[in-house]
Design a protein with these regions (language model features):
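C-terminal structured interaction module
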Residues: 272-322
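Extended, low-hydrophobicity segments enriched in charged/polar residues
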Residues: 2-264, 271
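Short linear motifs at secondary-structure transitions and domain/linker junctions
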Residues: 112-113, 124-127, 264-267, 276-281, ...
Length: 323
């Protein structure tokens, strides 16, 4: 039997934990109304005597709220819902919110309504009520091809049963486990010190580094090239020039990364330096963890382990199941 590896611990002073793809935290609005001029959208509540039945059979999102419906599709979406209710005999309709619902408020609603999650522009978010008075240990079980599972422990009570809780969709190969209030202080892109790094790697990295005068970063065989601690606008302008070079037909093959000194940069530095690809930083008075999936992107089932009284003991994410 594989031995669990301790990845670290998170704290959750608000008592409400958020789990999602950590690479998408750039979209998190906290207590603010989501504001995306490029992708305007509307949020709806399903109302009426048959609201829950209509939500279940319509099956577009979990619960009786429908978030982030693109503005250009609102009329068609509403007509589709109305037709669905007529066909199924449901007494329900859509009521648009005056403005989009802040992501922090979506967490509050999901926890209070005992809904398993919600979406942020199509990205699954799983919130859950957890103990606020102690650190929550995060462990992982190793397997042949990566982690078999990860587990966030709420108590040391024996597990009597396990329920399907939801599913995490990941496009950036990383999970985040974070206090819902603390995420309102998260800076995903804005540099905290006004600086940024610009890193090059790949097949033709030496050629590109020579062209742009990028120094080596270290002295190992797999060394990368680039600049660290540049003023943000200088790093940005160099990045634009390098991107232009990369996009030239028949040009060199390489990759590069623009890394502003944000909270995301801080925690990913710890992740890259960690044997187990997990890191914890404090933001907004809480310890937040970023942990790589170990298997890249995908959809990962999440289970809720409970004790004999049905009280949650832990959340468990299935990662690389081995048959």
């Amino acid at each position: 039997m594989a031995v669990e590896v301790v990845l670290g611990a998170v704290t959750c002073p608000s008592g409400q934990l958020v789990m999602m793809d950590g690479g998408y935290l750039e979209m998190w609005s906290g207590e603010r109304v989501p504001d995306d001029e490029e992708r305007p959208a509307t949020d709806f509540a399903i109302v009426g005597p048959d609201a829950e039945a209509a939500a279940d059979s319509f099956d577009r999102q979990t619960g009786t709220r429908l978030y982030d419906i693109p503005a250009h599709a609102v009329a068609e979406f509403t007509a589709t819902f109305d037709e669905h209710c007529r066909e199924h005999g449901h007494g329900a309709s859509l009521r648009a919110f005056k403005q989009q619902v802040p992501h922090r408020e979506r967490v509050r609603h999901a926890v209070a309504a005992r809904e398993p999650g919600f979406i942020v522009m199509g990205v699954p978010v799983l919130p859950i009520e957890v103990p606020a008075d102690r650190p929550l240990s995060v462990t992982a079980v190793p397997g042949e091809y990566g982690w078999q599972s990860m587990r966030i422990e709420f108590s040391d009570a024996p597990v009597a049963d396990s329920w399907v809780f939801g599913e995490l969709g990941v496009d950036h190969a990383r999970f985040v486990f974070a206090d819902a209030d603390a995420l309102s202080s998260w800076e995903h892109v804005r540099p905290l010190d006004g600086l940024a790094d610009l890193i090059l790697w790949g097949r033709d990295q030496e050629q590109v580094a020579a062209e742009f005068g990028a120094p080596p970063l270290g002295d190992t065989a797999d060394v990368e090239y680039g600049w660290v601690d540049l003023p943000i606008m200088e790093a940005y302008q160099r990045g634009l020039a390098i991107e232009t070079r990369r996009n030239e037909p028949g040009g060199p093959k390489f990759a590069f990364d623009f890394r502003p000194h944000s909270h995301h940069w801080q925690v990913m530095g710890l992740v890259r330096a960690s044997e187990h690809e997990a890191g914890v930083i404090q933001v907004g008075g809480a310890d937040i963890m970023m942990a790589m999936t170990s298997v890249g992107d995908g959809f990962f089932p999440v289970h809720l382990d409970v004790d004999v009284d049905g009280v949650p003991v832990a959340l468990r994410i299935d990662i690389a199941r081995e048959d």
